[in-house]
Amino acid sequence: MLSHRLENGVLVLTVEDAPGLREQNLAALISDLVHVHDPTPAVVVLGTVVPDEVIEAVVEAYRRCRRSDVLISVATPSAPARRTLQAQAAAQGGGLVVHARVDTAVRTADATAA
């Protein structure tokens, strides 16, 4: 499941347990919400255990949104997920910002957009 809210001028998208949600569907949901709220920066929040399918969906959503020039960040306490996200984003040319904490991600996105 994907929930969203606006916090301090930042679109915060929270990915929760979504058994059966396909990677492409999640990528489409994330990218559609980012496009609808363009030019608002976005933070995708992931949990402590992040399945590979969710990582792939976030990277795919980021790829879909690159042309719009919207700042997209990811926040997850999972160090392995952060490393994987950074490596996959770097392979696509970089630009995806990855944080360990949600509050840091939101503050940084807000400050960068200002």
Residue locations for each model-derived region?
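STAS-like cytosolic regulatory interaction modules
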Residues: M1-V50, E60, R64-A114
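Internal alpha/beta domain cores that form substrate/cofactor-binding pockets in large enzymes
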Residues: A57
